[in-house]
């Protein structure tokens, strides 16, 4: 028995550096096993000569194309039915958006980071997680993918597409532009904050399961935001999604409030980046110490 007790003592001493739970994780030993990655350069000319740079852009294009194709088709399926009980309803639409984000982030995270959203790209750029060159390239490819995805849906079901709003985001009757803007800001804040938390490099360094599970909370956040804001704006929180549907549908009312679906998500993404980097992680203060 004495030998076994000694083994237990040795084991406890050997693994005493394991990560504490809760606020204890904020102790003085934080820097022993983790070093903050350097910020991405604003411009990185070498990227333009790398195939991985263009491969990542293509991945963003294809992912956003598939995202718009599945989600807009789902919206059309609900819109054409006179009885919402006979279709998947709002919950089904929310699941299609959240489920596709879950699947596509899982598929593309190792190639491009799995942004699939200019607001996510913008937030990560503000946090210096990627260069301006890559951010602009991603946003362009995301918008092109969204336009093509919505265009294919219209090609399959033109009458249904044009007769049921084309999945374009508009502020619903009974709500003001301020309501719509606020819903888009808060909804995008939730999404981008979840992205920062789920992909946090410090957590990844300490918990090996975090990178594998990251797509799940991101997709679930998209699902929940859609449940809450579909009745208000149809839920944008993704400027590429809103732009693609608006361009292909191309009716006046789809453009009247279109600015909301760019300003709202970008403001929400900026707030999420500031909150996570400055308040939660205190990155600026660490760099001075």
From Swiss-Prot:
It comes from Oryza sativa subsp. japonica (Rice). One of its GO terms (biological process) is response to water deprivation. A motif (NPA 2) lies at residues 238-240. It is found in: Cell membrane. Belongs to the MIP/aquaporin (TC 1.A.8) family. PIP (TC 1.A.8.11) subfamily. This is Aquaporin PIP1-1. Its main location: membrane. PANTHER family: AQUAPORIN OR AQUAGLYCEROPORIN RELATED. One of its GO terms (molecular function) is water channel activity. May function as water channel to facilitate the transport of water across cell membrane. Aquaporins contain two tandem repeats each containing three membrane-spanning domains and a pore-forming loop with the signature motif Asn-Pro-Ala (NPA). Keywords: Cell membrane, Membrane, Repeat, Transmembrane, Transmembrane helix, Transport. Residues 1-36 are annotated as: Disordered. Induction: Down-regulated by osmotic stress, chilling, drought and treatment with gibberellin and abscisic acid (ABA). Increased expression in the recovery (post-stress) phase of gibberellin and abscisic acid treatment or drought. The lineage of its organism: Eukaryota, Viridiplantae, Streptophyta, Embryophyta, Tracheophyta. Pfam families: MIP (PF00230). Recovery of PIP1.1 expression after chilling is increased by pretreatment with mannitol. It is a multi-pass membrane protein. A motif (NPA 1) lies at residues 117-119. Expressed in roots, leaves and anthers. One of its GO terms (cellular component) is plasma membrane. SUPFAM superfamilies: Aquaporin-like. The chain crosses the membrane at residues 58-78, 93-115, 136-156, 178-198, 212-232, 260-280.
